[in-house]
Amino acid sequence: MKRQLLVALIFMLCASWSKASIDPQKVKPVKNIILMVSDGTSFSTISLARWLQYYQDPSKPKLNLDPYLCGTVRTNCSDAPIGDSAPTTSCYVTGHASRAGYVASYPPDMGAANIDPIDPKKSYGPMATLLEAAKQLQGKSTGFVVTCEFPHATPADVSAHYYNRGYYDGISEQQVHNNLDVVIAGGNNYLNQEQENYLKEHGYTVCRNDIAGMRNCKSDKMWALFNGTSMAYEIDRDPSKEPSLAEGVGIALSKLSKNKKGFFLLVEGSKVDWANHANDPASVGPEFLAFDKAIGTAVEFAKKDGNTAVIIVADHATGGMSIGKASLRNYSKRSKAELFQPILNFKMSLDALGAKLNSEPYENLRPVFKEYTGIDLSDEEVNLIIHSKGYNNSPIPKEQRKEQQDKPLYSPSFSGLLSKILTDHTCLAWTTGGHTGEDVYLGCYNPKGQVPLGMNTNVELAHYMQALFGLYGKIDQFSDDIFTCHDVAFNGLDYKVEKAKDKGSFPKLIVKNSANGKMMTISAFSNIAQISGSESKVIEIASVMPYVDRTDKFYVPKDMAKYLK
C-alpha cells in the first residue's frame, strides 16, 4: 500500500511539473511592470560578471540580480529551439512564439517544424503587445531604455510589428506613432526630420546627443537618442556624453511614475548580446555589470513604490562562452587572480581596440597593444594582425594578405581576429559567434510575493506578466480588435492599396464610401488617417496601422469604417 501511495505521489508531482509554475488566474495585479531583458545572456555570462565584481571588490560577492533569481525560461522560436532576439522578446509581450526575424508578428505554418500550434490564417499579421494593451486599455504610460539603436529587435518587439526585423524604416515609423512616453536609446540615424517634427508637435522633448538636455528635461514625454547607431559599450562609454543604463532607467522611472494609472517600462542590456556575438572578452563582463546596476535602480524604485513588479530575464543565450577550456592546462587549480586579472587588463572593447590600432602607425603596434591589453604580442600574433584586411597600417598589400578570421555579426572582421588573440590569453572560450539554445535565467521581484518558480516556457512567462496587469486571456482579443485585415474592416466599401512611390515613402490605403462621397487615406505604419469629402479632417487613433507586403493588407481597428459614415 505504501509503495502504491509513493508511486501515486510521484505521478502527481510529475504531472504538476508539466504545468505552469504559477496559475496566472491567481496572480494579483500590480500597477507597474518593469521588464528587464539582458540580450544574449548565458549563465556563464552572469558567472563571469559576478566573479569580476567580486575579484575587484571582495565586499560585493553577489550581484543585484542574485536575490531575485527564481527559475529558468525555455526560450525558442515558433519553429526552431534556438531563439532569435526578435521573436523571443516578442513572445514575452504577445504570448505567442514566432519565427526568427519576426517583430511582434504572427508566424507562418511550418508544418512538422512547429513547436506550438499555428493558425495559418493569421500568418505575418501583427500581434498586440503588453505595452500596447497597457497604454490603450488601461491608460498607462509606456517607454523603453536600451543601449542599441531604438528600432533594433528588442525595443521594436514591444512597440512595432513586421516580419523583418531589419526593416528599420517601417519599424521606426511605428515607434514614433505608437504614443510611447519615454525613449532613451541609441539611433540618431534612424529618426528622420519628419518624425522628429511629429514628436515635437505632439509635446515631446527630443534630445539628440544631448545628455545635459536629457538630465534637465522637465517634460514627461521625451525621446533621448545617442550616437548614430548603438550606444557605446560600457567599457568604452564616455560618461560626459552618454548615460549609463542605470541612469537612463532612473530618468525614465521619474517620468513614467507620475501617471497614477501606472506604467510599463522595457529595459534592455542590448550589448551583452553584441559582446557575446563578437566573442569580446573585454566587454562581456562590464556590459552585464552595467545591466546589473540598472537592476539595482529598478528594484530600489519598486520596493519604495510597493506596487511595481520587476521581471528580469534573457531573451536567449549567445556565444556559448565557458570559463575554463582544454587549452588552458590545470585551469581548475588556478587562482581567481590568474583567471580574471588578464581580463581586467583589457581597457577597451575589441571594436575600440581595432580602431585604436588603425589610428597608430605599424611601428607602434606592439607598444599600443601592450598598453591597452597587457599582452606582449608574439611574432605569430603580429603575423596574424598584419595579414588582416581590417588592419589599415599593415606593411603587406591587401591583395597579398591571408586573412584567417570571419566577421562577427555587429563588428568589423578585424575585431574577430583580435577576439582570437585576446581570448587565447584568458580562461574563456566560445563555441560560436551566434545564438545558443540553452534555457536562460529568470529573476522576479513582486511586492505581492507571487513569482514563477522552476522552469517556465516563454509563453508561460508572457501569461504571468499579462496577469500582473489583469490582462490574462484578453490580449488576443485586443489584438484582433486593433489589427483587423483592411478587407474585413472595410467590407462593403471601395478600397485599394497604393504601393510606395519611392524608397523613402510607405504604401497608402485609400477607402471610399460611395454613398456619401467620403474618402479615407491611411499611410502605412502610422496612426493617422486623412478624411476628405464634404469636410476634411485628420484623425489620430490609439494604435498604429501596419502594412504587410506578404499579405498585401493593412491592419486597422475593426471599427475603423465608422469614420466614413
Locate predicted features.
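Structural beta-sheet core signal
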Residues: 35-36, 144, 312
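Cleaved targeting-peptide boundary
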Residues: 20-26
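A post-motif C-terminal structural segment
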Residues: 30-32, 41-47, 51-94, 99, ...
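N-terminal signal peptide c-region/cleavage motif recognized by signal peptidases
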Residues: 15-18
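Sec-dependent N-terminal signal peptides
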Residues: 4-13
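Extracytoplasmic mature domains of secreted/periplasmic and thylakoid-lumen proteins
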Residues: 96-180, 187
